[in-house]
Design a protein with these regions (language model features):
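Bacterial N-terminal signal peptides
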Residues: 10-20
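Bacterial N-terminal signal peptides that target proteins for export
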Residues: 2-10
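GH16 jelly-roll
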Residues: 24-278
Length: 278
């Protein structure tokens, strides 16, 4: 699809920017991207202007049955992912494929920026069109590049956007830490009513600073968490590098808590762009 990109700041496609231990070349194939107020550099982006599999220099794949009792098997490569017309599409299917001699009833995909790109502070924005049927669970989220403070939830998790198909008008923003997480019922979560989100493109953003996390929907701030005075890693582990995950789950402890409609598959989750600024 054609993207609306304003000409405001020339960004060289050859300019190399070091982020943590990662060196990255930010590009803007369709034009020059607006730099948000308070930021000076585009340090990672994908406009998905290629055809076929996503750029392997930017994205990796999770594989297998991974978490939350979900029904889908995450496939590697471009089996359930495709780039065309400036959009990346993740498709959850009821296709009964064979993997290592076993029949997998439901497949989907989860793409990640690790190891290509990790970062600590800045602004991440994803423009996406989410699907909705009984069982769908699309998400945009961040996990630690290294478990500096220990395994989940000790090193944190930031959910930029989550949506479950049985409650289609709501978008969820969350952060999980050792002190504040869903297993304790103490997670920091905010829910907005956004009935227009399903089937239309909208932007989902997160601003990360040393002392604050701020979630945005269509460029408007929706939720903020501030670091408590004298807090330690148990409540604020967000001073380490994270990577980005974009996935479409089906079923599981939350997505399938009201049942699933397997006959609704395939379902498609479309990503117009991913941009990260410093």
């Amino acid at each position: 699809m054609k993207k609306s990109i304003k000409l405001t700041l020339a960004l060289s496609a050859c300019a190399l920017l070091g982020i943590g231990a990662t060196v990255w070349a930010a590009t803007a194939a369709k034009g020059h991207i607006t730099i948000p107020d308070g930021y000076s550099e585009l340090v990672f982006n994908d406009e998905f202007d290629n055809t076929g599999a996503p750029d392997s220099t930017k994205w990796g794949f999770e594989q297998g049955y991974l978490r939350n009792g979900e029904l889908q098997y995450y496939m590697p490569g471009n089996a359930n992912v495709n780039c065309a017309d400036g959009v990346l599409t993740i498709e959850a299917r009821n296709d009964s494929v064979s993997v290592d001699g076993k029949i997998i009833p439901i497949t989907s995909a989860s793409i990640i920026t690790r190891p290509a790109f990790t970062w600590k502070y800045g602004y991440v924005e994803v423009r996406a069109k989410i699907p909705s049927s009984l069982g769908t669970w699309p998400a945009i989220w961040m996990m630690p590049a290294e478990n500096v403070y220990g395994r989940w939830p000790r090193s944190g998790e930031i959910d930029i956007m989550e949506h479950v198909g049985y409650d289609p008008s709501k978008i969820h923003f969350s952060a999980h830490t050792e002190r504040f997480n869903h297993t304790r019922g103490t997670q920091r979560t905010h829910v907005i009513e956004a009935p227009e989100a399903v089937g239309q493109f909208h932007t989902y953003g997160l601003k990360c600073t040393p002392d604050r996390l701020t979630w945005l929907y269509d460029g408007k701030e929706q939720y903020t968490i501030d670091r408590e005075e004298n807090s330690d890693w148990t409540s604020w582990p967000f001073d380490i590098d994270y990577y980005l995950i974009i996935n479409l789950a089906f079923g599981g402890g939350w997505g399938g808590s009201q049942g699933v409609d397997i006959n609704s598959l395939p379902q498609r989750y479309e990503i117009d762009y991913v941009r990260i600024f410093k």
